Amino acid sequence: DQYRAWLLQLTICDPACGSGAFLNQALNFLIAEHTYIDELKTKVLGGGLQFPDIENTILENNIFGVDLNEESVEIAKLSLWLRTAQPRRKLNDLSSNIKCGNSLIDSKTVAGDKAFHWETQFPQVFERGGFDVVIGNPPYVRQELFKEIKPFLEKNYKCYNSIADLYTYFIEKGINLMNENGLFSFILPNKFLKATYGKNIRKVIK
């Protein structure tokens, strides 16, 4: 029961969720863990009630994502809906958990309507200090392609380097989104570990 309670309050976020591949895997993992608990309790106790409607509970409480692309956000919602859809059961409104916005920028002057305030958008998460798990595969974008936001990045990110790839800023943002006991896992190229432009993000990670 303690493990179940821990699972039910776990918060998992992909700050560049795209069409939801990582969020779907997180959903699958959590469903599997709850199923395992039900099976174990049945085996040990000789019976028992399964947790009702666990898929919807997970979607409402455990899974969070943000992406800049509106179409990707809608696809992510749809893929999660399809994974949990059952006859005669109302689908979740995932707009509270899966949102469209610029994960890196909270300034409307810079990002317009896509400016994203994490603490405002997910207050229930940040009341507890942040997300328990941050996962994803951030966008790899060469610095020449986002010159217009560099002044903001320089002012707001410790990892700033004029030739750094966009994914380095996602690393810093992801780390800052976690609570003090959080876990962080991104798929990343290893160039930042040796390249000059990675010096500042290496300091952030340490």
Model-derived regions, located:
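SAM-dependent methyltransferase catalytic region
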Residues: 1-206
